[in-house]
Amino acid sequence: MITLIKTLGTAALLTAGVAGAARAADIDDRVTHGYADSNGVKIHYATMGSGPLVVMIHGFPDYWYTWRRQMEGLADRFQVVAIDQRGYNLSDKPAGVENYDVRLLVGDVMAVIKHLGQQKAIIVGHDWGGVVAWQLAINVPQVVDRLIILNLPHPRGLSRELAHNPEQQQNSAYARRFQQEGAEKSLTAEGLAGWVKDPDAKKKYVEAFGRSDFGAMLNFYKRNYPREPYTEDTSPVKKVQCPVLMFHGLGDTALLSPALNGTWDWIDKDLTLTTVPGAGHFVQADAADLVTKTMRAWLLR
């Protein structure tokens, strides 16, 4: 079964975002911080609430704090855990491109789940966190209870669009730049935080990026992002075996919405796809209230 939802306009999104920012201003005082060991790599996480485990995985450029509004909205019914991926903020930053292989990133999430005494979790991922989340669901299905993806198409969809869609090829030029040697030298903490709209949050982001390793951030692209010449993945499909909720801000210029087409063919359970006009790549921030309320309703159904 597939449910398609198209909702909200720009004005409503802006109102929701301002309200969410005010409520989340002091979340630092209400989370507990911890570390899990992932084969010698220390993975930092922030957690709040109790109940079924929800693990949230950020993308680029970001850190655990991106989930603050969703954490607040779920913590009365769930234990919500937001991690810093390796290379970011308070997590370890191992040297070497090979240490950012997606299989190791998957292992980091599994280490957090095990560290918290659980065998499975609801997995939430945005951008590169979405890459990790998809790979968990596809290759380690026994640890994924349900899957929530934000602005990251299924890998089959992205593979197809990179191979055949000139607009997606053009809009992925940033990734090709990131794959070049020394690309991190052009990055600054202030520049990476440029997408953050709330001034107080932006200060936190600049501090977090100051603790991060820019080269490590780009190793995600160097190790895992497809390289030219792009080819479509036509290998046998391993279907996702759990229910899936997807959000896609339609203003995303990095990951275009045509990559969503066909997603239902790669999922064996129900898929709920929520497209959000007026929101961009960081839909969890641009449409914070919508994302949180939809996520909560879907999880509690």
Where on the chain are the PLM-derived regions?
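Catalytic histidine-centered segment of alpha/beta-hydrolase-like enzymes
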Residues: A279-A288, T292
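Conserved HGGG/HGGXW glycine-rich cap/lid loop of the alpha/beta-hydrolase fold
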Residues: V41, T47-D92
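Bacterial N-terminal signal peptides
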Residues: G9-G17
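Sec/Tat signal peptide C-region and signal peptidase I cleavage site
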Residues: G20-A24
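Flexible "cap/lid" subdomain of the alpha/beta-hydrolase fold that forms the substrate-access gate
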Residues: A25-V31, V41-I43, L53, V81, ...
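Bacterial N-terminal signal peptides that target proteins for export
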Residues: M1-G9
